[in-house]
A protein has these predicted regions:
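Serine-esterase "nucleophile elbow" of acetyl-processing enzymes
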Residues: 1-48, 58-67, 182
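Short, flexible loop segments at the rims of nucleotide/cofactor-binding pockets, characterized by
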Residues: 47-51, 134-135
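Alpha-helical cap/lid subdomain in secreted, periplasmic
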Residues: 57-202
């Protein structure tokens, strides 16, 4: 039996979709279909609206985290939304990578990071009055920091930002709140993760 720890924000808890339709649960379904036993439900430390520092505080309160076979990290959209600087995010994100690594006994091959989705490419984004070109540029800057940190530590990074942009005009890919991804979009994330074959030798 393998145990998966998912760290993040609203995207990780699957805001506006059923709990079993979160991307991490759909991913676990696909891992199980390949013959790997995964403890369910996946253990999630995440909440809508959390920034990197708020996630770190929640992890501290949840200590000891214990030992895990897999750990995922998806965080940062709320840092960008609140106008926080990239340098501060970079430091806090790197500390969260330390936490994820510690949870899997410092095995980088057992950590999976996902990029920050582009919330500007949603019905909510279109109606919010923000400069969406600037929003996309800021998200790109955050994701560049994520890319550099993951590359330096040989940690796998899945680019889901490109999916949120590619399917932005498809109403099936947005949840009813107009902001978060739908179960169908999360299915694309889960399938993309399976295609990497990352955990094929569990």
């Amino acid at each position: 039996m393998h145990h998966l720890l998912a760290l993040g924000d609203s995207y990780t808890i699957g805001e506006a979709v059923a709990p079993d339709q979160r991307w991490v649960e759909q991913w676990a379904d696909l891992i199980q279909a390949e013959g790997h036993a995964i403890a369910r439900p996946v253990h999630v430390i995440a909440q809508t609206g959390w920034t990197t520092d708020e996630l770190a505080q929640a992890i501290t309160l949840a200590q000891p985290l214990g030992a895990w076979d897999l750990a995922t990290l998806l965080i940062g959209v709320n840092n960008q939304y609140r106008g926080r600087d990239v340098d501060g995010f970079d430091r806090e994100f790197n500390a969260l990578l330390d936490t994820a690594m510690a949870a899997v006994a410092d095995r980088p091959e057992r950590v999976q990071v996902l990029s920050i989705p582009d919330w500007g490419q949603t019905p909510f984004g279109a109606a919010c009055g923000r400069d969406l070109i600037q929003v996309s540029a800021e998200i790109d800057a955050y994701n560049q920091a994520i890319t550099q940190r993951c590359s330096a530590r040989s940690i796998a990074l899945l680019d889901v930002t490109v999916l949120t942009r590619r399917f932005s005009a498809d109403p099936r890919m947005h949840a009813e709140d107009g902001l978060h991804p739908s179960a169908a979009m999360y299915r694309l994330w889960a399938e993309a993760l399976i295609c990497t074959g990352k955990f094929g030798r569990l």
